[in-house]
Amino acid sequence: MRVDIVELLTMDKVTVIGLGYVGLPLSLTALSAGFEVFGLDVRADYIEKVKRGDVQMAETQGGRSIQDILVEAVESGRYHPTTKPDEALGYDNQQIILTVGIPLRDGKADPSMLNSALETLGARLRKGALVVARSTLVVGYTRGFIAPKLQNMSGMSPTDDFDLAFSSERMAEGSAFDELVGMVTPVAGLTPRATSRSARFLERLGIKSVIQASCPEAVETAKVFENIARDVNIALANEYANFCTAFGLDTKEVLELVRTHKRVGFLHHPGPGVGGHCLPQAMHYLKPPAEEAGVGLPVIETSRQVNCNQPIHIARLTLDWLKDAGRQKGKVAILGLAMKDYSTDARWSPAVDIARYLKAHHGGELAVWDDNVDREHVNLDLDYADTLESAVAGASAIIVGARQSPLVTGSVNDVSLLDGMDKPALIVDTRFAFDRKSVLERGVDYRAL
């Protein structure tokens, strides 16, 4: 198969399969780069929301919300969200980006959604197509899972008849548009031609720095390592925080002192655990090939367990404090349910895990507040407060699970909010949202984790 460079540069259609937290902003990035874009997703109700700009994402570009960008995109006539594969893939010179994730089922990577997407794509794949997988994969999946599946479904060779590559996405939710084009982006195909072709394609999307790697396995492994590195470092910070709390030390002060050392200034912040789709699952994308090769991962596995246990540790610390204060039935308020600060995403949220544990083990009132997270996504029967003030009112303990406005960046200046608590009272601040000294001056005990 030959792809003429002039022909390549005039290809103007792109199909993005999977319009989630990666695929949706990526599809809009392709549109802004001049492509006509087809966005394919199996969720019919979600596609209708996309067409209306009704999505639960906190992304902005140039001061405009993703919701406004979506409405304008659909009205342009060059952006086509659809559930119909024949519509999304019915053109020659196909350029396809796969952003279908691999969730965990019973602690193991489950590629069933990816497999289904590949069946849909493979049955419609045309000679000369370019396929770039961008969702994080189990190491070895580009060559060992995606390629054979597409070959079996299409009857074509992934080295001769179409090009297949893997390129890791490194965007963080809330910064998607900037980081999709601004972050250095590695890519590698099954062949040198696939590598160079996919690199040119990514550059046409507006990505400023594309690195051509030696093989897909190198890019897959690097991506998983990136996520694991953060998971491990957060686990270390969480253990530091747990130690400081047990010894009555100011966690924030101690960590700031540590960071004055120039060789450890990168120390992560502790928190309620690690949430979202990416970091908690990374170990499970590395484990299958590691086990097959007989390579142990004790540090990685222990760190994952530390972060898994952190929500339970925080919940138990709160319950122990209430018991010692004679407030076993006291109201507990959880402020912020998102998986990280200023997010709409509650997948794998440690704050939700805290709420789930307290719902099962706390005999008193439990209230939660989060203006950004869709309650349907939490999948937990809770007493949702309409305002921050009503959540805090009468509470014996507050757990800060995630900062959301008006829990603004840095310290909350108006600690008069705490005057509504039922004292003696406690704040378990997993996000350093409150100033410790100001809280103590209000007669409220303070723990930073």
Where are the language model's segments positioned?
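Structural/interface elements that position substrates and couple domains in central-metabolism enzymes
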Residues: 2-449
